[in-house]
UniProtKB/Swiss-Prot annotation:
InterPro entries: Chaperone_Skp, Skp_dom_sf. GO terms for biological process: chaperone-mediated protein folding; protein stabilization. This is Uncharacterized protein aq_157. It comes from the Bacteria. Belongs to the Skp family. The keyword Iron-sulfur does not apply. GO terms for molecular function: unfolded protein binding.
């Protein structure tokens, strides 16, 4: 009986040692995205860039519509109509190029901002984990249950928005 108790005690000690060495935490990434001022600023920057391109495209579209209406004028000579048709063709080409450029630049800008945000969040999570001697950090949203004591989201948010 004493041998069984020693084995049981040794097993419990081993299990207790394992559970203490598995220090982990979680970060609610949805909350970080939703509440971070840093991320909101990056999104605003992207939105401004989008609005700038939308304005340029709308201006070209209005100009194109005006040219098309003037082409319908019966007062224009054939030579003037040909000139207007070439202007329309040129403007349509410019508009297509602008749309492609806008899409490309916005995609690139979005990727740059996402990488910058991701890198900063990872750096903060790593720093926080090292300070607290945490061995692993998970996304709270992928866990079925967690004790709120292991949630370091607010610390990450505070550091991110400094």
């Amino acid at each position: 009986m004493e041998g069984i108790m020693k084995k049981f005690f040794a097993l419990m000690t081993l299990i207790a040692g394992i559970s203490f060495s598995l220090d982990f935490a979680c970060v609610d990434t949805n909350k970080v995205i939703r509440e971070s001022k840093f991320i909101a600023k990056a999104q605003t920057e992207l939105r401004k860039e989008l609005e700038k391109y939308q304005k340029l495209i709308q201006e070209k579209q209005k100009k194109l519509e005006a040219l098309k209406k003037s082409l319908e004028s019966k007062a224009l000579s054939e030579k003037a109509k040909e000139k207007k048709a070439k202007e329309i063709e040129q403007l349509e080409d410019e508009l297509r190029k602008l749309q492609v450029e806008a899409q490309s630049k916005l995609s690139r800008k979005k990727a740059e901002l996402e990488k910058m945000v991701f890198d900063k969040v990872i750096k903060i999570v790593e720093s926080t984990a090292k300070k607290k001697k945490i061995k692993a950090v998970f996304d709270c949203n992928s866990m079925l249950y967690w004790d709120k004591k292991i949630d370091i989201t607010n610390e990450v948010l505070k550091e991110l928005d400094k």
